[in-house]
Amino acid sequence: MKRVVHAACPHDCPDACGVLITIEDGRATKIQGDPEHPVTRGFLCAKVAKYLDRVCSPERVLYPMRRVSPKGSTASAGEGARATQSWERISWDEALDEIAHRLRGIVAEYGSESILPYSYGGTLGALNGASMDRRFFHRLGASQLERSICSTAGEEGLKSVIGIKLGTEPEQFAHSRYIIAWGSNIHGNNVHLWPFIEEARRKGAKLVVIDPYRTRTAKCADWYLPIHPGTDAALALGLMHVIIKENLFDADYVSRHTVGFEDLRARAEKYPPEQIADWTGISSDDIRKLAREYATQRPSVIRVNYGIQRSERGGMSMRAVTMLPCLIGSWKDIGGGLQLSLSGSFGLNKEALEMPELMLKALGRPARIVNMVQLGSVLNSLTAPPIHALFVYNSNPAAVCPNHNEVVRGLMRPDLFTVVHEQFFTDTTDYADIVLPATTFFEHKDLQAAYGHYYLQVSNQAMDPVGECRSNVEMFRALAERMCFEDECFLETVDSMIDRALESLNPRLKGITRDRLEREHRVRLNFAAATPKGAAESQSITASLKRCPDTNPDSSAAGAAPFLPFAQGNFPTPSGKAEFYSETLKRQGLDPVVAFTPPHESRHGSGSKAAGFPLELLARKPDNHLNSSFANLPSVRAMEPWLGDLEMHPTDAEARGVRDGDRIRAFNSRGEITLQARVDGAVPPGVVAARLDWARFSPGGGNINVLTSEKLTDLGNAATFYSVCVEVELFRA
């Protein structure tokens, strides 16, 4: 029997695609995009288009497995060898009994905070991302994980100005006249925004790309501006210098809807284009040209992504960029504003899903918080108490964590009990004691929000789990039973949890129920209920519609009038306005306006060259992987021919006697790796770049994170993957 199931892609991507899965005789035989989804519109990215290779892979973990060889002994073995030589198959009952026994013993001897959950964005489904797992660890009294490895610096920088993760909806990009992709490889990892940009360009829009790496998007741009890594705040301040000095800002919008303009004016005065040119590598003429075009060619919009916040001053960089649309008033325009993340709009009832009050039952207080970026130090140095059990799911820390050598040293500890819930044997399972088989999104039901559009979806289960795989929800439910947790929340069904997630005070969820989502497959958030329009805002939208005569607010693609979140201010900040000056930052001992300070590890920093590491490293994510996901699939790896390469500028290569194709050694004080030199024009002088891969596929068994640092960002305690300096030389065996 053949049937088609509506689902949604849960991977860590802004697009959250609507998906159609064809099932025949209980097996998935086809995956395709849902043509009725207003944003993703029926096509899939190259990696998810090959998702059957993932679901049906012969390398799936199908049964609970227990280690029978020393930790790390399989790090360079093949998949078949790994399964037969390192593991023995056990039943779920055996696995759960052993895990529960070990956890109870650790709690009794060291206390519950010696147990650490470790998860991130392996799925962004509301339930399998953060529900039963959080309940379990809260009830256990385990240490809390500060999940900050990816995006928190940018989010905190954004919110310090506008108060919420909200912005320009993707459909409106089609009506922009000037589009800046700032640290955003749209063509590579936000592909469903690209058609809207192409539509705008067909109508005459200009696409500008600001990025230290010549990405796919940069190659398609009308104007590409390579920038020195970590200098984005300087460029934004230079643009504001020109905009203010030449009176190109929207004085009325600034007066009515912002605070701290005079402080910003005084600060921007100190950043003339000539000084900015020295820091950024962008000429003063180009800085002036960019400022003038951005401020005058309206509607203008910035698609800024998380690349700019993965440096030591990443939070302030995002804060500076977020000020730009507030300064020129582009929030008033359809096709204007800025987009980083739209996830703050959904407002699901996370407290009902996660139940943090369970910590009080276990500890009588909230548990301590441990930062995920610093896992190496946490496993090797943390005391009071040390970590004695690590439970990994939705993540692959042995591949994605910075300071890889320290992470592996910690994972190798014989006294560390490690459980990994996974779909495949990964770098992290090489150090696990127990591996549990996990479902893909084909095999469980979930509720799916997005951070790149405003549509909420139910992702339906399409097929039975393969082998003995279990979802995060079902696995933690079973483990709670083994731990004798009698709280009723561990018996709650998936449908009930979806219902409770939708029972929110957020007015944008008004009228959105599970029944409606299952019937309609996707529902746009209810902005009419959330932001009733006064006369002034209605006039603003009407005026913007007149500037975009091809916009039909009642079209099926939009489904409602365009959403202009800050056309009339309404910023959910302490002041109720966009904050050029932040009292909150001041109370935290931080600069209340914005400034540029060079990252310590950078060409302008205070010691990288003196330490003998003059090259700035970009530890990039492959276009066709999602962080470390998909890296083990041959059909997807075939689309990434540059894995294992270090891209260099010809000037830097020549100075070191390196030619294209040579085997080289990249190193700093934290470690070294061997790669193959690729001498091309993808990076400017002084910059090198390499793509993240699994350590087991990398020469020498260590990936690019051997070189990265545990140092945290200025805001949000995030990772500084792009504040790294190295030296390169020819490899000598």
Task: Pin down the residues of each PLM region.
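N-terminal leader/propeptide and maturation segments of large enzyme subunits in energy/redox metabolism
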Residues: 67-70, 85-89, 94, 241, ...
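Active-site phosphate/pyrophosphate-binding segments
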Residues: 239, 259-375
